[in-house]
A protein has these predicted regions:
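N-terminal leader/targeting segments and the immediate start of mature chains
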Residues: 16-64, 203-218
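Short, solvent-exposed coil/turn segments at beta-strand boundaries
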Residues: 38-45, 60-69, 81-87, 138, ...
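Hydrophobic lipid-interacting interfaces of membrane-associated proteins
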Residues: 49-55, 93-94, 184-188
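Secondary-structure capping and domain/repeat boundary segments
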Residues: 218-290
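An acidic-aromatic
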Residues: 55-117
């Protein structure tokens, strides 16, 4: 009987150790599993909150259709809401509805959305950290890592001298449940950031307000954009944009000195985005190098 009990205890210890044992995992696995596209194959949304000193200071909400980023501030909040077609930006007293343009016509904000991706918010360069340990328990994997020497050298200009991280992952999917980040700076200041991830979360309140507003026809105005007017490259596109918001046109820095905006076909009246934000609008875009 004693042998049976002893064997049972030994078996229990073995199973416990196995359940809490080391696990092989790479940062590349974590990085790949937490790409926005990968996460949204299994979830309708990804909601990421960064907390420091007990207060949320950054929110990211992602779906297949849009990316939302909100940062509360002492004097004013900062918010961006990006779809493939447009981007809302709230900073200070200005709320701007941007569209992206190129010399060849209208572009999209695919790159803007990528910058607010889950991988960008949750984990950076897969080669920028070194895993020190990884263990598995109760269906979760806990990974301890530190910045690589190269990453520390790259971050020297902002004063970071060291950093360590703790990832808590779903053992099956490798999806990040939480991330704790500890940064030490050359002035002796330490920053402790806790990142929590919620999958299939409800839409944040401010974003609900934006979506509800733009879904009401009476809140929209027609904006017609005529690119390269009077040339063989002329292109016209009409979109609906929210009333009350400044209508902005965004373009690459490389073409900044070659583009002009007007409100008449003869390209004599310069476009003033603050002039009237409630009525229908036509903007003529003249590219001076085409």
């Amino acid at each position: 009987m004693k042998k049976i009990v002893a064997f049972a205890l030994l078996l229990c210890m073995v199973l416990t150790l196995a359940a809490c044992g080391k696990v092989e995992i790479t940062l590349q696995e974590i990085y790949d599993a937490n790409q926005t596209e990968a996460l949204l194959k299994n979830h309708k949304s990804v909601y990421i909150q960064d907390e420091m000193d007990g207060e949320v200071w950054n929110e990211v909400y992602l779906t297949k259709e849009y990316a939302y980023n909100y940062i509360p501030g002492e004097d004013s909040d900062w918010m961006e809401f990006t779809t493939d077609d447009a981007r809302y930006s709230l900073a200070g007293d200005d709320c701007v509805y941007y569209v992206y343009i190129t010399p060849d016509g209208m572009g999209d904000f695919a790159n803007e959305r990528a910058e607010r991706s889950a991988s960008a918010a949750l984990c950076g360069d897969a080669e920028g950290e070194i895993i020190e340990s990884a263990s598995k328990k109760d269906g979760l994997i806990t990974v301890q890592s530190v910045l690589s020497q190269k990453a520390i050298e790259d971050m020297a200009e902002v004063g970071v001298t060291s950093a360590k991280f703790e990832y808590v992952l779903d053992a099956k999917t490798r999806e990040i449940i939480s991330l704790t980040s500890d940064y030490t700076y050359d002035d002796g200041v330490d920053f402790h950031v806790i990142t929590e991830v919620t999958y299939d979360a409800d839409v944040p309140e401010m974003l609900q307000t934006i979506l509800a507003y733009e879904n009401q026809t009476e809140n929209l105005r027609n904006v017609t954009i005529v690119s390269n007017p009077g040339t063989e490259k002329e292109e016209t596109k009409t979109i609906q944009a929210p009333k009350g918001l400044i209508f902005g046109l965004e373009f690459d820095d490389a073409v900044a000195e070659t583009v002009e905006f007007y409100t008449d076909a003869a390209c004599t009246e310069a476009y003033d985005p603050y002039a009237d934000t409630d009525t229908d609008l036509t903007i003529y875009i003249k590219w001076t190098n085409t």
